[in-house]
Curated annotation (Swiss-Prot):
Residues 1-26 form the signal peptide. Belongs to the OpgD/OpgG family. The gene is opgD. Keywords: Periplasm, Signal. Predicted to be exported by the Tat system. The position of the signal peptide cleavage has not been experimentally proven. InterPro entries: Gal_mutarotase_sf_dom (IPR011013), GH-type_carb-bd (IPR014718), Glucan_biosyn_MdoD (IPR023724), Glucan_biosyn_MdoG/MdoD (IPR014438), Glucan_biosyn_MdoG_C (IPR007444), Ig-like_fold (IPR013783), Ig_E-set (IPR014756). Pathway: Glycan metabolism; osmoregulated periplasmic glucan (OPG) biosynthesis. GO terms for biological process: beta-glucan biosynthetic process. Transmembrane segments: none annotated. Probably involved in the control of the structural glucose backbone of osmoregulated periplasmic glucans (OPGs). This is Glucans biosynthesis protein D. HAMAP family: MdoD_OpgD. GO terms for cellular component: outer membrane-bounded periplasmic space. It is found in: Periplasm.
Amino acid sequence: MQRRDFIRNASLALAAFGLPSLPACAASRSGQMGLRRLGQPQPFDFATLKGQARALAQAPYKSHKRVLPGRLEGLDWDQYQSIGYRQDHALWADQPGKFQAKFFHLGLYFHSPVRMFDVVDGKAQELAYDGAAFNYGKSGIKDGELPADLGFAGFRLNTRKDTDRDFAAFLGASYFRAVGKEGQYGQSARGLAIDTGMGKPEEFPDFIAYYLEQPSADSDTIVVYGLLDSPSVAGAYRFAITNGDVLLMDIDSALYPRKAIERLGIAPCTSMYQVGENDRRMAWDWRPEIHDTDGLSLWTGAGEWIWRPLLNPRNLRFNMFVDRNPRGFGLLQRDRNFDHYQDDGVFYEKRPCLWVEPKGEWGEGSVQLVEIPTVDETFDNIVAFWNPKEKPQPGQELLVGYRLYWGAEPPARPPLAHCVASRTGLGGVVGKKREYFSWRFAVDFEGGELARLIDKGEVEAVVEASRGRVEIVSARPLREINGYRAMFDLVPPEGSTEQIDIRLFLRSGGKTLTETWLYQYTPPPAGAPERTLY
């Protein structure tokens, strides 16, 4: 299956292979309200889950895909969205803790069941599907007409104080997402990415079971375990989720490859970028900007801070940023101005940043960025992940730990000035005839020491390009933001449409003042409108 088809259709393959099989008849309420429990509680911890993943990897992969009843297959988006979960069936609704869990119904794009377990005092018990736990809304489905053992598609978490608004959700393949204090969903994370952006179909691992650990009454953290499976790898995950203004997920994972993996993506972030200040190739919409995030931020092992604005390219674009023991990376939404989006329905200015902080040393590898052309904001066309230099091999155990931060600001910020806007347009000198094609870049920086240098005029822009030539370079104060604007024109080689890598930073007296701004520009082909204006 092609990546675009998968993301649009979300034909997810899930099943119960490798988990203890419990008969549906062995069900009980275990003295709790809500869903029935299947079988007897079994001892469970992260080591147990690793053992399950290891056993999965040692056996041939079996597809988990199932065919849904026709009534569920035929649901449209509005019908599926109208199916709600009843509050009186929420997991832990009768417990004194701060958190509850509710479950997603199968249907629409979500075709295969995921097993759900409740973990209490170190023992796990499977939760039975119950059609009576759902309100079927406008779907046309009546309680009792679906199979009694149908299963669930995923789950979401909410607080006891706000049962109508969830702060994290796990739904579809290995996708999950969360929100900060803004309460607005945006980009997603995944358990794993395999062969993303290559000349062959991408592989999408599935979480085939989740174990939700009942938190203590005073705990601010909820722990979730996930069992992952795919043709290439099986894995065990532990998520310690702490809700707050910036939501934290502390993740430990153990991966067990079935076969060699050519491109393994650790801590993948998945986002959407259609049009923004720097890239208006698809600017046919009435809204000035449409994106979940506007840039990739990197904090390298050597301590350099890098900002790479995102693009909606004409063709699939792949970039790798080689590093050793990275300190962090993430897809960020730095532009928080409603006027720049004008969308009062999906609120792009409130979309969360997602920052990845490695635990321990990750060694050699690269942060890889995949940008895919899109004309549709419902298609996630941006992926960023860590790819280890050493390729995983069958029989290995790969242990990886990291933290994910979801919120308006990442937990780590460069001590230097940072980029707040990147704009592009036709180059040349206003009022003078253009003798050749050039492209203008205007990059705004704020923070660091820039504010105190505004009146001193000692700041210069340092620009490098991999081909072509750079001209009309300037760095001037921008008092509206207490920062500086760097401007320059790039003149591509005559007739060339090869990509050009650009590097920019500001300095004063030999001292670096800003993070490093990187860009990849593709000159337009002959005959393009911007080529005819000189």
